[in-house]
Amino acid sequence: VNTQDSWETLSKRLQKEPFVYLQMFSDVNKHPLDNRVSCYYIRTMTREFIVPVHHNEKFSEDIQYLNIDTPMLVSDLKSHKHISMITSNEVYDLNWCHYMKTNQPYDFDKHLTTAHHHNYRLHYDKENVNDIIPLVKHAEYFEKVSKELMVNFEKEYDQTILEVLYEIEKNGLYTTDDKMVYSEYNPYTLTGRPSNRFGGMNFAALNKKDGSRKQFISRHK
């Protein structure tokens, strides 16, 4: 999608049929709540599209948010609810479907292209690296991921745990330096108990004796 006309045509189409929605965040290291959408991929029954948002190949400075009534399939319900360019009341998590069928989380990294790996290594200390990786490479990655995830799609799986973990995550943790820190719950564990970590910190196992917990305080005082 590289013109306003093609964007408007796509937006009308999405109001009429179910589709897969996969998004690429600009920064590979930031939490979704501290991030932005670089581009997103749409797969309908017959067509594929990629829409640049903050990517340097974007055709507009103002890509609109869409709120639709049609079903949409996403790769991660929690991150989708944190930040997404398209919202719907009927959203299904493809990774959760894959896990329920195979008892294993889907490996999203296995289809990253050479361009992704090269830029991640070269610009490991830079922000928003995904904005400079060619859109065609993001599209190549998304195409393979969407095809594999669709194999295990089922509407019937209960997603309540994902909704609950999203509600916890979005509130964050207040710190002594007047900032918010966000964690990420992972329900895809061998024990079935969600882990809680992000950015190298295990929030579920903060040491009680070395002061690790003192930086987190109540925001309700």
Predicted regions and their residues:
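Acidic, glycine-rich two-metal-ion catalytic cores of nucleic acid-processing enzymes
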Residues: 26-47, 177-221
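Conserved RNase H-like, two-metal-ion catalytic cores of nucleic-acid enzymes
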Residues: 1-115
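A glycine-rich phosphate-binding loop feature that marks nucleotide/adenosyl-phosphate handling sites
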Residues: 83, 156-161, 178, 182, ...
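Generic low-polarity alpha-helical segments
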Residues: 22, 42-43, 112, 135, ...
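Alpha-helix initiation/capping motif
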Residues: 52, 59-62, 67, 76, ...
